[in-house]
């Protein structure tokens, strides 16, 4: 069976604000199955933003687990991310999940992978998914050469990725804090 694939997620920090956005396209093989999926959510009483790239069902499982870790560790984003990554790497049922998570609160942005990686970006920018490299290049240029807000940069970067990546559309969800 073919995999659901493709998306673009971008997380941008600027001037004390963070914006996390994603497109809405879900693709199975070469067919668009849905154009308005919400791949970005608010968690933990709206104090944490989270977005996913990869399998939709896998991502929802990971969102649930991550929110549980946030509850357990009183909203400590880094600790919750590390504990989720440990479980993801070691628990047999979770090891097969294929997704990436980008998470952010007011102070920190992190990329969480199934290999047990928890990565904090050095340049206030996370971009992932099939359109990630395009969004990252666009966002980096906008961060370096404009005074646009984090939200404006995320939106423009996602739209540029949608122009280039066939697995990314312009139905955007952007959350900001």
UniProtKB/Swiss-Prot annotation:
Catalytic activity: ATP-dependent cleavage of peptide bonds with broad specificity
GO cellular component: HslUV protease complex; proteasome core complex
Regulation: Allosterically activated by HslU binding.
Compartments, as annotated in UniProt: Cytoplasm
Active-site residues annotated for this sequence: 7
Name of the gene this protein is made from: hslV
InterPro entries from the UniProt entry: ATP-dep_Prtase_HsIV_su, Ntn_hydrolases_N, Proteasome_sua/b, Proteasome_suB-type
CDD domains: protease_HslV
Enzyme class: hydrolase
UniProt name for this protein: ATP-dependent protease subunit HslV
């Amino acid at each position: 069976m073919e995999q659901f694939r493709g998306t673009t997620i971008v997380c941008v920090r600027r001037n004390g604000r963070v914006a996390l956005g994603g497109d809405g396209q879900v693709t199975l093989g070469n067919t668009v199955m849905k154009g308005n999926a919400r791949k970005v959510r608010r968690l933990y009483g709206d104090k944490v933003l989270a977005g996913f790239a990869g399998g939709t069902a896998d991502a929802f499982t990971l969102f649930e687990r991550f929110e549980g870790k946030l509850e357990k560790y009183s909203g400590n984003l880094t600790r919750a991310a590390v504990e989720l990554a440990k479980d993801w790497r070691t628990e047999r049922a979770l090891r097969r999940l294929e997704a990436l998570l980008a998470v952010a609160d007011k102070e920190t942005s992190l990329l969480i992978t199934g290999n047990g990686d928890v990565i904090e970006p050095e340049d206030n920018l996370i971009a992932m998914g099939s359109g990630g490299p395009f969004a990252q290049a666009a966002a980096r240029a906008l961060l370096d050469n404009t005074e646009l807000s984090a939200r404006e940069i995320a939106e423009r970067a996602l739209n540029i990725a949608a122009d280039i990546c066939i697995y990314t559309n312009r139905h955007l969800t952007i959350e900001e804090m």
